[in-house]
């Protein structure tokens, strides 16, 4: 893994806002953008201490960061998040919507509460983050939304709610890319497979053949790595590096795309 000293500061002068950046994939994205010189707004909802630790880690890269609390399932809080970000840094160039919660539940047991909880965070929140980004980003900005390989996978039982919530995001991506074009803003989505986070720890066994609850993590990792030509599962830095590319000025011709981030895994 390259150190911050070895990473060109290709995003110097840019300001990024990353939702759900206090841990997991969001943290990995925030840190990778910071390594390249971007100032970063670290959004969190409840985990204030981890978010501040991300801010402190970013400071060690030589970049600036601020943690801002906001529940992005509530549109007034999304508006406040953007206003506070603009007040702090003066402008925004990059917005990464990293919200997501995963659920496995038989379709005949899904309740209204389940549906609202998953779609409010995975889908509705991402729409309004993209909407605010479209309004507030400077010309030439970058929007990156979060889909999942699950949006297009078949053969995973009890997964309709999560898969559907992410599939909608792919539709948002293509439509926003058209509408934001006059501002030279690109809009893309990433669709990671398994990434070593707390969500992975809780749910990855579902994707392993003959997986079961309580399965040792070493067996889960081995089972999923066997599908990948690179022989491992992803870590948040892998995702952050791709987002850093999409945030770079050189990525302008990548627009309206959903990029699978699986290391070439075949399941």
Curated annotation (Swiss-Prot):
Q: Which SUPFAM superfamilies match?
A: NAD(P)-binding Rossmann-fold domains (SSF51735)
Catalytic residues identified in the record: 147 (proton donor), 148 (proton donor), 162 (proton acceptor), 166 (lowers pka of active site tyr)
Q: Please, which domain of life does this record's source organism belong to?
A: Eukaryota
Cite the EC number.
1.1.-.-
Supply one GO molecular-function term.
oxidoreductase activity
Query: Which organism's genome codes for this protein?
Result: Metarhizium guizhouense (strain ARSEF 977)
Q: Which InterPro entries match?
A: NAD(P)-bd_dom_sf, Sc_DH/Rdtase_CS, SDR_fam
Which residues are involved in binding NADP(+)? 25, 45, 71, 98, 162, 166, 195, 197
- Give the similarity note: Belongs to the short-chain dehydrogenases/reductases (SDR) family.
Report the record's disulfide bonds. Answer: none
Protein's recorded name: Hydroxynaphthalene reductase-like protein Arp2
| Enzyme class (EC, first level) | oxidoreductase
Q: What does this protein do?
A: Hydroxynaphthalene reductase-like protein; part of the Pks2 gene cluster that mediates the formation of infectious structures (appressoria), enabling these fungi to kill insects faster. The product of the Pks2 gene cluster is different from the one of Pks1 and has still not been identified.
Please provide the record's keywords in A-Z order.
Answer: NADP, Oxidoreductase
Q: Which Pfam families match?
A: adh_short_C2
């Amino acid at each position: 893994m390259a150190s911050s000293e070895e990473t060109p500061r290709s995003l110097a002068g840019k300001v990024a806002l990353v939702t759900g950046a206090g841990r997991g994939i969001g943290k990995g994205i925030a840190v990778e953008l910071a390594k390249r010189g971007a100032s970063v707004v670290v959004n969190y909802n409840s985990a204030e201490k981890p978010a501040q630790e991300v801010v402190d880690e970013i400071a060690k890269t030589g970049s600036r960061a601020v943690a801002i609390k906001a529940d992005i399932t509530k549109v007034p809080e999304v508006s406040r998040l953007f206003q506070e970000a603009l007040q702090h840094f003066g402008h925004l160039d990059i917005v990464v919507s990293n919200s997501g919660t995963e659920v496995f539940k038989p379709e005949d047991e899904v309740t209204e509460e389940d549906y609202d909880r998953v779609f409010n965070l995975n889908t509705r929140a991402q729409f309004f983050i993209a909407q605010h980004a479209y309004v507030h980003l400077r010309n030439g900005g970058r929007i990156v939304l979060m889909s999942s390989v699950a949006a297009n996978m078949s053969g995973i039982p009890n997964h309709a709610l999560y898969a559907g919530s992410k599939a909608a995001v792919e539709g948002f991506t293509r439509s926003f890319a058209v509408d934001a074009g006059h501002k030279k803003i690109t809009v893309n989505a990433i669709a990671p497979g398994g990434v070593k986070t707390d969500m992975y720890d809780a749910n990855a066994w579902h994707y392993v053949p003959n997986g079961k609850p309580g399965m040792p993590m070493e067996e889960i990792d081995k089972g999923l790595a066997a599908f990948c030509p690179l022989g491992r599962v992803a870590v948040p830095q892998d995702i952050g590096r791709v987002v850093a590319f999409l945030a770079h000025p050189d990525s302008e011709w990548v627009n309206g795309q959903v990029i699978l981030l699986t290391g070439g895994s075949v399941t």
